[in-house]
């Protein structure tokens, strides 16, 4: 099994020979530890730094740098909102974001993982939705670097006061999104 352990920057991958590709949907590109089958049929394992989304076009390598694999975003069922009225598209994005929906925003369209309830909301706002198969590359969150999708909640500093509540949170409910804020934990 090939152990893919490192991400390559664009500069690092320039001039390297591509071994094969790895096509994954978004639900698997958010994982850092994963057994996969490369597009050429070889078995591989991802052993990457936690909390970073794999983006289409990004290259991975093994410890020796001998194997270079390019990630491809798989086509998956998505809802795409195309709109020439940028104010309407902005309003739709606002309402989707208000529901903590991972959202891909591009010039003239927005895309999210298909959900008929969200589709009905978009139509109710005056938009139109096309359900299609397409790669899904959501925006990195405001508290995340553009390189990844996870978050870290470091809380090592002294507040100068005490609390009778915990500053920890659980990732047990994958449907909940946690956003760390100083002294509070807001969950959806």
Swiss-Prot record:
Keywords from the named record: Chaperone, Cytoplasm, Nickel
Subcellular location: Cytoplasm
Gene Ontology annotations for the cellular component aspect, listed alphabetically: cytoplasm
InterPro entries: UreE (IPR012406), UreE_C_dom (IPR007864), UreE_N (IPR004029), UreE_N_sf (IPR036118)
Biological-process GO terms, alphabetical: protein folding; protein-containing complex assembly; urea metabolic process
GO molecular function annotations of the record: nickel cation binding; unfolded protein binding
Pfam families: UreE_C, UreE_N
Region annotation Disordered: where it falls in the sequence: 142-174
Similarity-based family: Belongs to the UreE family.
Job description of the protein: Involved in urease metallocenter assembly. Binds nickel. Probably functions as a nickel donor during metallocenter assembly.
NCBIfam families according to UniProt: PRK13261.1-1
Protein name in UniProt: Urease accessory protein UreE
Species this chain originates from: Tolumonas auensis (strain DSM 9187 / NBRC 110442 / TA 4)
Lineage, broadest ranks: Bacteria, Pseudomonadati, Pseudomonadota, Gammaproteobacteria, Aeromonadales
Gene: ureE
